[in-house]
Each structure stands twice: as structure tokens, then as C-alpha cells.
Amino acid sequence: MSEFTNVTIIREANVYFDGGVVSRTVVFPDGTKKTLGIMQPGEYTFTTGAPEIMEILSGELDLKLPGSDAWNRVGGGESFDVPANSSFTMKVLSLTDYCCSFLG
């Protein structure tokens, strides 16, 4: 889906890691939420409450998911699932555009 209709956009930005990651929250009529954001090159560790699906729209990063010691390359057009109540680390290699869907 490249376009969202009939949604509410939260005006205030979500700013993490001194501006290295910035997103906006999109709220759908059924109450579900997504964030649309940009990540600058760098290393970032996030924690989750609800399970998430991260879609990488463009850019490239190396990803370490919970319970794994391996780094996996993820690029534009790919996605990955993050379990609830966990943390994951990304080494962002180039400017990365993403969409994060919150499932819980």
C-alpha cells in the first residue's frame, strides 16, 4: 500500500537518537497505528511493547533480532517482524525510509 486514506496524522514528530530517527504517527479509523519515518546512518537499538512489522521502503541496514547473534542485511522492499516486549538493533547503512506497523 503506497497511500493511506481517511487517516489522522499526529502533527508532533517522534524524534529518537538526537534526530537520527524521526517519524510521524498515522492513526487509522479502526484505531490501529503505523509510523512513517526516516533513519540516518548509525546504530540504533529499539524496544517494543507490541509486536511490529517493519517495512523498509528504501535504504539498507543490518539487523539483529532478539535471540540471535547474527546480523542480516535488509533493504528497500523487504520487511521483518519484531516480537512484543523485546529489543532489536539496526546498523543503518544509508538513509532509510520505513513504515512500522504496530500489531497489538
From Swiss-Prot:
Recorded catalytic reaction(s): these are:
a purine D-ribonucleoside + phosphate = a purine nucleobase + alpha-D-ribose 1-phosphate; adenosine + phosphate = alpha-D-ribose 1-phosphate + adenine; cytidine + phosphate = cytosine + alpha-D-ribose 1-phosphate; guanosine + phosphate = alpha-D-ribose 1-phosphate + guanine
Top-rank EC class of the record's enzyme = transferase
Q: What is its EC number?
A: 2.4.2.1, 2.4.2.2
Q: Which SUPFAM superfamilies match?
A: RmlC-like cupins (SSF51182)
InterPro entries given for it?
Ppnp, RmlC-like_jellyroll, RmlC_Cupin_sf
| Keywords for the protein's UniProt record, in alphabetical order | Glycosyltransferase, Transferase
Q: Known Pfam families for this protein?
A: Ppnp
From the UniProt record, which GO molecular function terms apply? guanosine phosphorylase activity; purine-nucleoside phosphorylase activity; pyrimidine-nucleoside phosphorylase activity; thymidine phosphorylase activity; uridine phosphorylase activity
Any one of the GO CC terms:
cytosol
Give the signal peptide, or none: none
The family note in this entry says: Belongs to the nucleoside phosphorylase PpnP family.
> What PANTHER family does the entry give?
PYRIMIDINE/PURINE NUCLEOSIDE PHOSPHORYLASE, PYRIMIDINE_PURINE NUCLEOSIDE PHOSPHORYLASE
Task: Report the protein's function.
Answer: Catalyzes the phosphorolysis of diverse nucleosides, yielding D-ribose 1-phosphate and the respective free bases. Can use uridine, adenosine, guanosine, cytidine, thymidine, inosine and xanthosine as substrates. Also catalyzes the reverse reactions.
Record's HAMAP family?
A: Nucleos_phosphorylase_PpnP
Question: This chain belongs to which protein, by name?
Answer: Pyrimidine/purine nucleoside phosphorylase
